[in-house]
A protein has these predicted regions:
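A glycine-rich phosphate/pyrophosphate-binding beta-strand-loop-alpha-helix module
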Residues: 32-34, 60-77, 112-113, 117-118, ...
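Structural motif
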Residues: 20-23, 27-28, 55-61, 95, ...
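Glycine-rich nucleotide/cofactor/substrate-binding loop typically near the N-terminus or early
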Residues: 14, 27, 32-34, 39-97
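Phosphate/pyrophosphate-binding betaalpha-module
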Residues: 118-171, 178
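N- or domain-start disorder-to-order transition segments that initiate the globular core
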Residues: 1-19
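N-terminal low-complexity segments that are often proline-rich with Ser/Thr-Pro
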Residues: 169-211
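Short, basic, glycine/proline-bearing loop/turn elements
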Residues: 1, 90-101, 151-158
Length: 212
């Protein structure tokens, strides 16, 4: 139903049609991650790095009620200048933002959703949300994990502040596989925990993958 509100940039659309690699990028880092103009400079540098490595970047956001897969430099600057005035958009927020014609900075959850709608299979981010320490009493569990269980988009790595044992338990509930981080030239079943220096947790599958 939301597909009719989806705008795929010409660059991204042509890359997908030609079978070129496309990498989705979130937009909360632009609006909420750092101040202007560093946020815009960082976003543009990330896109530049992706292009230099042979792929096409697709920064994802909601602008005036449209689901954007691939932003122009002007749209990135628009989000960067607006900053915290742009609300973070999770799955529950999409219908409201679309109906009101509002802007939204896409979290991991909505970036995955829109990437999948556009046909993008790989998503790069600083880290997904997860199960926070003490969640057995607070229920502080990120919507990112529910999305991982239902949206077939590859995304890398949890952040360090989370509870690894609770996260792995929750992964069984939503039925997703924690597999790898694709930032290096080797792949290992423990790479999900790349930002955690020491850990004693192991995943169920030890599979090596030649290509993302």
């Amino acid at each position: 139903m939301l597909n009719r509100y989806l705008d795929i940039s010409t660059e991204v659309k042509e890359a997908l049609e030609q079978g070129k690699p496309v990498v989705a990028l979130e937009s909360t880092i632009i609006s909420h991650g750092m101040p202007y103009p560093q946020n815009v400079e960082t976003a543009m540098n990330v896109e530049k790095l992706i292009r230099e490595n042979g792929a096409v970047p697709a920064t994802i956001a909601i602008i005036k009620g449209r689901l954007k897969a691939g932003l122009t430099a002007e749209e990135i600057d628009y989000l960067g200048r607006a900053g915290h005035a742009v609300p973070k958009a999770s799955r529950r927020d999409l219908p409201v933002l679309v109906a009101k014609g509002s802007d939204g900075a896409c979290t991991v959850t909505t970036t995955m959703m829109i990437a999948h709608m556009a046909g993008i299979q790989v998503f790069a981010t600083g880290g997904i949300g997860g199960v926070h320490r003490g969640a057995e009493t607070t229920m502080d569990i990120s919507a990112d994990l529910e999305e991982l269980g239902q949206t077939p988009v590859m995304v890398q790595t949890i952040v360090q502040i989370l509870s690894l044992p609770l996260l792995l338990e929750f992964s069984f509930v939503v039925s997703y596989h924690a597999v790898l981080d694709v930032s290096d030239h080797y792949y290992h079943h423990e790479r999900m925990f790349h930002s955690v220096r020491f850990h004693s947790f192991h995943l169920n599958y030890n599979n090596y993958i030649d290509s993302p």
